[in-house]
Amino acid sequence: MVVLRRSFHVYTRLQRGQNLTEKIVQQYSVGLAPGKRVHSGDYVSIKPAHVMSHDNSWPVALKFMNLGARTVKDPRQIVNTLDHDIQNKSDKNLTKYRNIESFAKKHGIDFYPAGRGIGHQIMVEEGYAFPLNLTVASDSHSNTYGGMGALGTPVVRTDAAAIWATGQTWWQIPPVAQVEFKGKLHESVSGKDIIVALCGVFNKDQVLNHAIEFTGDAIKHLPVDFRLTIANMTTEWGALSGLFPVDDTLINWYKNRLNIVGPNHPRINETTIKNLEDKAKVFKADSDAVYAKKLVIDLSTLTHYVSGPNSVKVSNTVQDLARDNIKINKAYLVSCTNARLSDLESAAKVVCPTGDLSKVNKVADGVEFYFAAASSEIEKEAAEKGIWQALLAAGCKPLPSGCGPCIGLGAGLLEPGEVGISATNRNFKGRMGSKDALAYLASPAVVAASAVLGRIGSPAEVWGIEDVKSSGLLAEELACNTETSTATPVSEGSAAKVEMLEGFPEEIVGELVLCDADNVNTDGIYPGKYTYQDDVSRETMAQVCMENYDGEFGSKANAGDILVSGFNFGTGSSREQAATSLLAKGINLVVAGSFSNTFSRNSINNALLTLEIPTLVEKLRSKFENAPKELTRRTGWFLKWDVPNAKVYVTEGSPDGQVLLEQKVGELGKNLQEIIIKGGLEGWVKSQL
């Protein structure tokens, strides 16, 4: 049983402090006005400490070269790794790998070849994702770096190319959710159980497109490996980052790391660790920092949790699923989520609890158990400790250090009708093989136990001991007033106006056209059948815009209108035409309750403006609640965006009509204005070369 309690807090401070996310962004923002403090909602230009790309490095390089760039801005900022398709030995893939390596060598970029490990793990081991820095990657699991106390967040390929060329890109600081851990985990319960439970309990998009900061006394008891797993799967939870604090546990991890990397490592050495210790003492969230919401979970009430099938939003205790006698065909211990040394050791303790290889618990008949280390370094250490040999003795099948089945590549994929259980991060239908297979996610110990039992079950069953008991998972949600916390009012005297660039309008005004639906996807905005037709004219793009959502959109919406829609607008694929087709229609601003992060990035990158105003969406829905249903509705309401004062006004009847809503919004700084003026990120990059 899950106990959910909900209460609300309203913040009315005229000025406020910064949370840890905002403080880190402040450090890595460029072009800020003197004295400017950044907050959630603000658009900022960022110069991240590092940017990682993996097998997609060659597409990024092609974008980079197509921009007209000749040399990278700062080779020390860039990291190239090969990890996704390393089992593919085709000429085409090997040529791509050679191209990436050649490009990296030419430009002096740090390069890690196939077999060295998964890019995110390399970023951790080699100190690129260092505590209190901002590190990005053109991969959705960049959130992983939050386990090291670094702010990690994903970017799209165009952003990566821009960073290569100019050293910077842009970011809109998301609302920040605070997640507090209380209590202490039972033995054998892991970080994977925590995040699987969180995804299943708080499964109503509570943290969608939020940055997360983990807090609470319980964190000191969580090993770094647990933190990395939790941060990694904040992606599946819907968040844009998952940041843990810097504490003694993390500092000691780095001190122990010195014994492996040696005293002369460029990023992990006595000097960097001492500087981190000093900085961490003072670099903390302010006491009056604002959070969009707060979630609390009592770890002492947690047992082993399993998500699925085919969804991270569905989770059950392993005891409940064990009673259902769910037979499995395949098990997996791979990926950037759970293939570190402690994960392999956890599985080895299930298959070989005594350490005697002659007394191992064999993988059940009819089950294939695939495993790989997150890096070659981990594989070597696992072999030195006998962990690797124990898994082999149990009948597990080794794979090279890479992504493999997690991304649906290489050996061991799920076949039609099969059931798999995996220590990876995604169990979407078809992700790990056939769309007609069922996939569950669990901790390494539960995966290993299930492989031995031949069905989903717990380590305690294999060991013949009493299982971890829980009287019910305790969790609560404390939600701030969204309007106040994400857009705190400021007095006229305390708020400096946004500096405006010549050529950018101080006011953006238009009539609101309502497409009243949540989760309007990219195929609804721009039909997939046109996506890979490179000769579609701008006029045709305008005609087909939103046709899969509503065939009447084209006749109802006019150039100069402002489109307003529901929550999670632009979900789905990464096609840039979802943004450019709206521009072709003459719509330069989209307002929604919330946006898909990828759509938001593609919008700014192509000079389409967006604003999140959930209050407006609710007001419109209330206004037309009893009106005849229309997929596209001309509302008769107008929106004016006062850009210098970062405010919006919604009026009725005309731009000068009765004010129905006045609200503060995020500031659009001059760096972002310049991107829009240049026609998008690519145009801006070209202007900088």
Swiss-Prot record:
Q: What is the lineage of its organism?
A: Eukaryota, Fungi, Dikarya, Ascomycota, Saccharomycotina
Species in which this protein is naturally found: Candida glabrata (strain ATCC 2001 / BCRC 20586 / JCM 3761 / NBRC 0622 / NRRL Y-65 / CBS 138) (Yeast)
What does it do? Answer: Catalyzes the reversible hydration of cis-homoaconitate to (2R,3S)-homoisocitrate, a step in the alpha-aminoadipate pathway for lysine biosynthesis.
EC assignment: the record states 4.2.1.36
What is any one of the record's Gene Ontology cellular component terms?
Answer: mitochondrial matrix
| Family, per entry | Belongs to the aconitase/IPM isomerase family.
The terms under GO molecular function for this entry are:
4 iron, 4 sulfur cluster binding; homoaconitate hydratase activity; metal ion binding
Q: Which cofactor does it need?
A: [4Fe-4S] cluster
Q: Where in the cell is it found?
A: Mitochondrion
> What is the protein's given name?
Homoaconitase, mitochondrial
Q: Which pathway features in its UniProt record?
A: Amino-acid biosynthesis; L-lysine biosynthesis via AAA pathway; L-alpha-aminoadipate from 2-oxoglutarate: step 3/5
**Where does the source fall among the domains of life?**
Eukaryota
Per UniProt, [4Fe-4S] cluster binds at 336, 403, 406
What CDD domains does UniProt report for this protein, alphabetically? Homoaconitase_Swivel
Biological-process GO terms, alphabetical: lysine biosynthetic process via aminoadipic acid
| Cofactor note text | Binds 1 [4Fe-4S] cluster per subunit.
Q: Where is the transit peptide?
A: 1-17
Q: Which SUPFAM superfamilies does this entry report, sorted A to Z?
A: Aconitase iron-sulfur domain, LeuD/IlvD-like
What top-tier enzyme class does this entry carry?
lyase
* Catalysed reactions listed for this entry: (2R,3S)-homoisocitrate = cis-homoaconitate + H2O
Print the keywords alphabetically: Amino-acid biosynthesis, Iron, Iron-sulfur, Lyase, Lysine biosynthesis, Metal-binding, Mitochondrion, Transit peptide
